[in-house]
Design a protein with these regions (language model features):
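Core SAM-dependent methyltransferase catalytic element
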Residues: 227, 233-249
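A short glycine-rich, Lys/Arg-flanked "PGG" loop and its adjoining helix->strand segment in the class I
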Residues: 148-163
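C-terminal alpha-helical "lid/dimerization" subdomain adjacent to the S-adenosyl-L-methionine
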Residues: 167, 171-220, 224, 230
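Class I SAM-dependent methyltransferase SAM/SAH-binding core
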Residues: 67-124
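Conserved alpha-helix/loop element of class I SAM-dependent methyltransferases that forms part
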Residues: 46-64, 81
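Helix-to-beta-strand junctions that scaffold the AdoMet/dcAdoMet cofactor pocket
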Residues: 87, 144-145, 158-159
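A short acidic, Gly/Pro-enriched loop at the edge of an enzyme's catalytic core
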Residues: 123-135
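A short SAM/SAH-binding and catalytic strip from SAM-dependent methyltransferases
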Residues: 133-147
Length: 249
């Protein structure tokens, strides 16, 4: 686990700029793949995605009766796992830009008490200040147009002392991670074309290639106002789990 101190000042210019794709383009793309999203996630991750998701939920440190926000919630699995931790007395909200993905989540988990899903923009979350104990985002940060603003909105939505967590695909460093990068670059587009969604999975590859290093993401989180920022590489560094704390106000 790698950490940066709370008073760390990143060197050099820093914009926190994110994905260049427009919100409309991203929304339409995810609407189109909503029905295939979960299966494709399993294939693309070589069946590792459920394990990574468990690590994210564990790190949130939620207790029964707690509350959580899941940003870029997709088909709702992370939010559902968070709800299983807080129980019927707790509250979990999933927010996603795509109406198609949100509809899948709403249908799938409509009978779960304390669990809800809304269409919303991560750049302007439909939440009150300090509303939740924790906020998560899994494989969604690289789709945002401004990473710093995304983290800042998550931090705004979490109470002082609460956690903000980000699970995302990382740049390759280990041999295993380099193999997985080859998998993403060469095999994932083929899987997408076979599934009839070639452009969408070509976008996936480009967004992974453009995503900053784990060290840079940690700096951006600190710039967004989070403290005790740290990150852990999972499965040989294929993905990284970033964690930060909302400071006491």
């Amino acid at each position: 686990m790698t950490a940066i101190p709370p008073d760390h000042t990143p060197s050099g210019a820093s914009t926190g700029a994110g994905n260049a794709a427009g919100a409309g383009e991203v929304r339409v793309m995810f609407d189109r793949i909503a029905g295939q999203y979960d299966l494709m996630n399993l294939l693309i991750s070589a069946f590792q995605e459920p394990r990574w998701r468990r690590r994210l939920v564990d790190a949130a440190g939620l207790r029964a009766g707690g509350s959580a926000l899941d940003v870029a919630s997709g088909t709702g699995k992370v939010a559902a796992d968070l709800q299983a931790r807080v129980g019927a007395a707790g509250r979990v909200l999933g927010v996603d830009l795509s109406p198609g993905m949100t509809a899948v989540a709403q249908r799938r988990y409509q009978h779960r008490p304390g669990l809800g899903y809304l269409v919303g923009n991560a750049m302007d979350l439909p939440t009150r200040d300090g509303e939740f104990d924790a906020a998560t985002i899994a494989f969604g940060m690289r789709n945002l147009p401004d990473y710093r603003r995304g983290f800042a909105e998550m931090a705004r939505s979490v109470r002082p002392g609460g956690r903000v967590l980000c699970l995302e695909i990382a740049r390759p460093r280990s041999p295993l991670a380099r193999f997985m990068r080859w998998w993403f670059d060469r095999i994932v587009p083929l899987i997408g074309w076979v599934a009839g969604q070639g452009p969408a999975y070509g976008y996936l590859v480009r967004s992974v290639q453009a995503y900053p290093s784990p060290e840079r993401i940690a700096e951006i989180m600190a710039e967004a106002g989070l403290v005790d920022v740290r990150w852990t590489g999972l499965t040989g560094g294929i993905v990284t789990l970033h964690e930060g704390t909302v400071p006491e106000r």
